[in-house]
């Protein structure tokens, strides 16, 4: 695995992700996603794709605001803010319409045929706190 191959795969993935194209084409068949804070884990190209889409377009109408990224031989990361509006069920919290902004990081394991693993360092407790604060009655 070379830095050039990792760069090509990651650039293609981000271009597809941000343009609304089929970003899952850059996943291996057995790709996995792990949410590190909760330990939640999904496997398979379609399942990982659906999780990313649901988080950005169903649970929230959200987008990342990139802070920094890096690529090495077989590995990559992106650090961003997750910015959006709460539009769907999140855990036991119904849609609130609240605006959220939380920092997060995703790391990627990359092999010759695509992205094999994603680990989302997403502060789920902070998201919950922002939603609960927004939906609390004014005093």
Predicted feature residues:
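C-terminal and inter-domain tail/linker signature
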Residues: 1-139
């Amino acid at each position: 695995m070379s830095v050039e191959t990792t760069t090509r795969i990651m650039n293609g993935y981000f271009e597809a992700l941000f343009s609304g194209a089929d970003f899952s084409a850059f996943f291996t068949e057995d790709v996995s996603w792990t949410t590190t804070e909760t330990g939640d884990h999904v496997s398979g190209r379609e399942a990982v794709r659906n999780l990313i889409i649901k988080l950005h377009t169903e649970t929230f109408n959200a987008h990342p605001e990139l802070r920094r990224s890096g690529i090495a031989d077989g590995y990559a990361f992106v650090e961003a803010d997750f910015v959006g509006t709460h539009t769907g069920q999140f855990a036991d919290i119904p849609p609130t319409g609240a605006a959220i902004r939380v920092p997060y990081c995703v790391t990627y394991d990359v092999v010759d045929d695509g992205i094999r693993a994603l680990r989302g360092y997403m502060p789920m407790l902070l998201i919950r706190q922002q939603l609960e604060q927004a939906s609390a009655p004014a005093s």
